[in-house]
Amino acid sequence: MLFFLGIDGLSPRILNELIQRNKLPHFQSLTQSGCYGELKTIRPTNSAMIWTSIITGKEAKEHGIDSFIAYRWQNRVIKKSVMKKFMKLGGRSLIQKMIQNREISTFPLSGEMIKVKTIFEIMSDASKKVGVINWWHSWPAEAIKGFIVSDRVNYGRWSEVYGKESPPERLTYPLSLLHAISDLIVLPQEVNLDAYRRFVDISEEEAQEMKTVAFQHHQLKSELKHLLSLDETVRKIALFLLRHFKGLNLFALYFRGIDIISHCALQYSEWNRDTTIEGEERRKYGKAVSAYYCYMDTVLGELLKKVSPHTSLIIASDHGFVQEKNGKFSHRRSKPPGVLILSGGNFKKGKHIMDANIFDLAPTILYLSGLPVAKDMKGKVLKDYIQEDFTNQHSATSVRSYGKREKKTPVSPSPSVDEEIKERLKALGYIDEEM
């Protein structure tokens, strides 16, 4: 089996330093026993766009995902990249006025906007069994050989908790899977006080405040409950499905929390060169980032116990973090590389990864799965890190293209669901304003 773990925002520098301090035993073991290095990324370092490039091997202009949201005007869909160009030409005030007058609306992008086939569909079409959990734009869940738990599954308990309309359609495939995992979904208000104090040094009163505080962009007080609910949901569902689904050829899952907590809390951490941060804030929030890396190491250990020792493991991140000239920690201007670990199974041992980029992962996964690589994919197979016993027995083959994605039955739009998802994206720091 191929085990593909996506961790948003996992930074090479922080990972290396914590490994050197023996804080991350499972990451340390994999980096020492496998191949490890940096993964080159692209600009803009937009998570939705990059993770879609990773599973298609193509750029945004080909796969169709350029942001987290798009615009709707007179029943026409306008991509954010197109809208930005118009605003640069002087149309910003006009667009803002049209949004205020509700002539233009925004909505969160979904898998319906992906124009080309993903590796999940390519493998399924070739009768390979695939399991997917929480990948960007995996909703609506399409029929594949295996299962999909979409990135909107946290909304599967809306009707129970909020008394609102029914949850969105096709949160999982098969549909019956939602019932099986519904008790594993952790909502933000269900995160307990002990979980907060694992990451921050605060009083019980302050922890209670964190549970109810209103959204503030990239403020740890408001975002911690959201990122914990997401990653705990993914962790619980992954462990459950690894027990109950056997014979998978690819198991792919994605965790978001490190990216969000890095945006919120690196400013309080030891990695901040700026000494103007108040001592009390550092005391409360200084351990948040390193503690979250340790949490992810624990999750990794739990997952590894559920898979065969012969599993080929890929761990990748879309970008890292750096402290930029303005003192803020980000990735938008400097395009810091992410992390790539290739370990176990058919991968070599103890080799440093050089010249790998995000577009190489789709071709490499197809090759390891015994499938042709499409010539119109931007990346290459990372053969230098695959054992020669495998490469000698498996010649690389290619096809011209896997073509466009088939048009699926559209999901009925739900304005209230879209608004709730936009609010969640704001709460997680992925969108600032509708512009």
Regions found by a protein language model. Give the residues of each.
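Active-site rim elements
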Residues: 14, 105-113, 224, 286-290, ...
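Short, structured active-site-proximal loop/turn typified by the sulfatase FGly-forming signature C/S-X-P-X-R
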Residues: 15-69, 131
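Non-catalytic, well-ordered alpha-helical segments in soluble enzyme domains
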Residues: 28-29, 120-124, 301, 344, ...
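Short, solvent-exposed turn/loop segments enriched in Gly/Ser/Thr/Pro and often Arg
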Residues: 36-55, 133-142, 254-257, 319-323, ...
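His/Asp/Glu-rich, glycine-adjacent segments
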Residues: 58-279
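Histidine-centered active-site microenvironments of extracellular/periplasmic hydrolases
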Residues: 310, 315-345
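Polar, surface-exposed loop/tail segments
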Residues: 322-323, 353, 358-360, 370-402
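Long, internal low-complexity/basic segments
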Residues: 383-435
